[in-house]
Design a protein with these regions (language model features):
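Conserved class I S-adenosyl-L-methionine
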Residues: 65-76
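Conserved Class I S-adenosyl-L-methionine
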Residues: 193-219
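Conserved beta-strand signature within the Rossmann-like core of class I S-adenosyl-L-methionine
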Residues: 95, 177-185
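Core SAM-dependent methyltransferase catalytic element
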Residues: 231-271
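Class I SAM-dependent methyltransferase Rossmann-like catalytic core
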Residues: 32-60, 64
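A short glycine-rich, Lys/Arg-flanked "PGG" loop and its adjoining helix->strand segment in the class I
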Residues: 85-86, 163-176
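A short acidic, Gly/Pro-enriched loop at the edge of an enzyme's catalytic core
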Residues: 138-148
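S-adenosyl-L-methionine
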Residues: 108-136
Length: 271
């Protein structure tokens, strides 16, 4: 792992790493449109664009082509990796902080990610992979990242008591003024968080409070990933909806019509 961190430091040096991030610079969603249309994207990921709004989301987080970006748990699917790695490969740095081979349940997916990077060096040859697990979070050298992003992970960390060490790792990795971007399934306000954690939903007010307790400051919110059709009252929780369809063929068309979950999109800064 020390070798990986030294490699990241060397890359940051080549990028003229400075000590402070520029807070959420204005970026147009149109900036990312050519990347969304690129041949590097898998059809399955493209099909999810109407629900995930990648151009608007990345613009909201203020990601520039010279940013150092850490994505938490991209997995082998690499939805955002397919967009960000080509975007950052010349001037910036994309770091994939992934569950590693030390955890058997994640080994196969992690190996798929590594193989994918190896098979497509023109796109992913500069991607750096670091470790992210419950007891060990060396995701990037301290104070090196402009942006840390996480998509639909918060509910798992809350359920598995991993939230506090995860947020500490993000804070340590970010430069002063760096951005933490969080997207997750938005919970109901008429239920406590305890009543809905197991269903995969997180109350937005609870998420904000917990993240601010870790030293971050809420900078802005966005409704770009909102879905008012999501009633949040399903037998199999949020996984009832696409893309999981945990109920399989039961009422599949009903859930397809609802679409993917209602999600909050939050931008925090390291103070």
């Amino acid at each position: 792992m020390k070798t990986v961190i030294r490699t990241v430091c060397a890359l940051l040096g080549a990028l003229a790493f400075c000590g402070n991030a520029v807070l959420a610079q204005a970026v147009s969603p149109a900036t990312f449109e050519p990347l969304l249309a690129g041949a590097q994207r898998s059809p399955g990921n493209v099909a999810r664009d109407p629900y995930r709004h990648p151009a608007q989301t990345l613009a909201f987080f203020g990601i520039l082509d010279n940013s150092t970006v850490v994505e938490i748990l991209p997995g082998s699917g690499g939805y955002y990796m397919e967009i960000l790695a080509p975007w950052l490969k010349d001037k910036g740095l994309y770091i994939a902080a992934n569950r590693d081979g030390s955890q058997p349940q994640y080994l196969a997916d992690h190996q798929k990610l590594l193989q994918r990077l190896k098979d497509e060096p023109a796109l992913y040859g500069k991607v750096v992979v670091t470790e992210f697990r419950a007891d060990h979070h060396p995701i990037a050298p301290p104070g090196s990242a402009d942006v840390v992003i996480s998509f639909r992970n918060l509910h798992n960390w809350m359920d598995q008591n991993e939230l506090e060490p995860s947020l500490k790792a993000f804070y340590l990795a970010l430069k002063p003024g760096g951005v933490l971007g969080i997207v997750d399934h938005r919970g109901r306000t008429d239920q406590t968080q305890a009543e809905q954690t197991a269903s995969g939903y997180v109350r937005q007010d609870v998420a904000i409070a917990l993240i601010e307790q870790a030293g971050f400051k809420l900078d802005a919110t966005s409704e770009v990933n909102a879905n008012p059709k999501d009633t949040k009252d399903y037998a199999q929780g949020v996984w009832t909806l696409p893309p999981s369809y945990r109920m399989k063929e039961v009422d599949r068309e009903k859930y397809r019509a609802i679409g993917e979950s209602d999600r909050f999109t939050l931008r925090f800064v390291k103070q």
